[in-house]
């Protein structure tokens, strides 16, 4: 609210990236020094998402930037969409949450930043999803694979979610695309 008042009061509708970075770093008390390169990438990602251009070409996703793209996808897109909780388990401990790609990063350049290709999962749910022990059907219900029964402890942990509808983002446009879930 104070930022809104500041910008409206002084008629500002644009801000230089360096000034934005300075203010952002001041606002977070320099707990995390955000470099200009990361901020430029963050702005670029948000512009791409708004334009529905979710592509990150392999030539863009160098070893140096891939992690930054994925961090922005996690912190700015997926976790906020799911109110910072696992869509399957409801776990809210931030350090245990992952931004899972439904269609893997390596498999589709065009959908890497697509909010509909991301789902917030806990560490265990993410590993189970990645290995196929759990899937999410087109009705957004968790399905536990028969393979999970081979490990009674694992099956005991995840079977309680079988048939349960996942927690979905409030904004319908950010919910998992059924076409991705069916791949």
Q: How should these model regions be labeled?
A:
Residues 58, 62-63, 68-73, 81, ...:
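A detector for short metal-coordination/catalytic motifs
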